Amino acid sequence: LGKTDTIHAVCILKGSVHFFSDLMLNIRKLNVKYSFIHVSSYQGTSSTGRIRVKSWIDESIHDEYVLLVEDIVDTGLTLQYIVRYLKKYNPRDFRIVSLIEKTVHDHGVPLDFVGFRVDDKFLVGYGLDIDEKYRNLPYIGYVE
């Protein structure tokens, strides 16, 4: 990746939005363009096992350096779905960064960058939510 190359950063909405924003503000020496994917697989504190695609990227990622930005990897179901479909577009390079990885599951998705790893707690804040609540907390906490 050279100084003239561009990273195509793809944010998985809604949970990743705060992490994505902070990350993008700190990538200063490279050109970056943004795309957004809006998917959901949770209801309350449980995975439904079904992926609901609400919106998909609207720009080509063919032959581009793609950085997929995720908030938390738990079961990996949502991430597996997204990765499988994005790789069909044949990006030049494909990397995944997740703010949080839960260590309890073998999700089967190799992550290139991880902020931190946690036990199996339901987290809220900094974009993470329960039924759309607590996303706006400026910190990450867990629910008992």
Segments and roles (model prediction):
Residues L1-E144:
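PRPP-associated nucleotide enzymes
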